Amino acid sequence: MGGMSENTPRYASGVALVNVVISGEHAGTVLDAWFPAPSLTQTPDLSIADELEDLAVEHPARNARTEVRSASINLDEAPEDAVDAYLRLHLLSHTLVRPNELNLDGLFGTLANVAWTNHGPVLAAEFQKLAIGLRKLGHLSVSHIDKFPRLVDYVVPAGVRIGDGDRLRLGAHLASGTTVMHEGFVNFNAGTLGTSMVEGRISQGVVVGDGSDVGGGASTMGTLSGGGKKRVSIGERSLLGAESGIGIALGDDCVVEAGLYVTAGSRVSVLLPGQEARVVKAAELSGVSNLLFRRNSLSGAIEVLPRAKNTVELNEALHLN
């Protein structure tokens, strides 16, 4: 899960405010880590440490304390622990590295399952016994129970609009000019590389090129479940129509018709001017530019034909964030 460099080791570092379980069988478990200013340097900048120390206190109601830690990691090696993992997620969401350009192998195993409350993170396994004490602090709400927090509680990317903060995980990579509408979803180690409209799902490992549109309810197949190894991506100026989906890479200037799901094993008829139609697996067209994928309304067959280098144009006014 994530790319690795064959050249000189790449490093990153930062200073974090870390929530840690105080006592009990889970003592020492890291609940989260917030890196206000991560950087691609081997040595962390400690200038922010004193300011963070003012926030280092105990939270008995959560059975947690906050403490300041520094971290320096090799991006080409697997995460060693939760603080290491959180630094990698912050690097992605600060757009310091792109999806698939750092090693995330084993990241899930380093993270605790957390109840994300309005009073701060609580270990999910301890939530029930801590609930009374938490309610004594005032109104108690839990946004979700997951290993990943919401992106917007840790990083607010520059130049983007987000309709619903609950639908973006920390580790999402949103380039300036991106608009994520209310039904859009972006997983960690996934996202946009330029100006894009996102009204559908961008799964783990998937990147969307500049000027492309993921239509309402559209989806992209990731590699987290099902054993998939082939990475799905969307090139520049391409469109996934509403309720469509892909399990292959789209090149530049491509369109997938609304409601059509193209998997790697889909049998598609290639229609070229002056030639007989031939049937191939969609995987053979992965990454090819200037294609239109559609479903024949009479036969139901999936067809693909060239688009004569037409482009998808986004409304510029919608992306001046």
Swiss-Prot record:
Entry protein name: 2,3,4,5-tetrahydropyridine-2,6-dicarboxylate N-succinyltransferase
Family affiliation: Belongs to the type 2 tetrahydrodipicolinate N-succinyltransferase family.
Pathway(s) the chain acts in: Amino-acid biosynthesis; L-lysine biosynthesis via DAP pathway; LL-2,6-diaminopimelate from (S)-tetrahydrodipicolinate (succinylase route): step 1/3
Source organism: Rothia mucilaginosa (strain DY-18) (Stomatococcus mucilaginosus)
Chief location category: cytoplasm
One protein family per Pfam: Hexapep_2
Function: Catalyzes the conversion of the cyclic tetrahydrodipicolinate (THDP) into the acyclic N-succinyl-L-2-amino-6-oxopimelate using succinyl-CoA.
Keywords of this entry: Acyltransferase, Amino-acid biosynthesis, Cytoplasm, Diaminopimelate biosynthesis, Lysine biosynthesis, Magnesium, Metal-binding, Transferase
GO BP terms in the entry: diaminopimelate biosynthetic process; lysine biosynthetic process via diaminopimelate
Active site: 199
Catalytic activity: (S)-2,3,4,5-tetrahydrodipicolinate + succinyl-CoA + H2O = (S)-2-succinylamino-6-oxoheptanedioate + CoA
UniProt GO MF annotations: 2,3,4,5-tetrahydropyridine-2,6-dicarboxylate N-succinyltransferase activity; magnesium ion binding
Matches recorded under Gene3D superfamilies: 3.30.70.2010, Hexapeptide repeat proteins, Trimeric LpxA-like enzymes
Amino acids binding Mg(2+) 1: 166
Superkingdom of the source species: Bacteria
UniProt-annotated binding residues for Mg(2+) 2: 183
Keyword Cytoplasm listed: yes
Cross-referenced CDD domains: LbH_THP_succinylT_putative (cd04649)
The protein's enzyme class: transferase
Binding residues for succinyl-CoA: 201, 216, 219, 242, 257-258, 265, 281, 294-297
Cell compartment(s), UniProt: Cytoplasm
Lineage summary: Bacteria, Bacillati, Actinomycetota, Actinomycetes, Micrococcales
GO cellular component: cytoplasm
EC number: 2.3.1.117
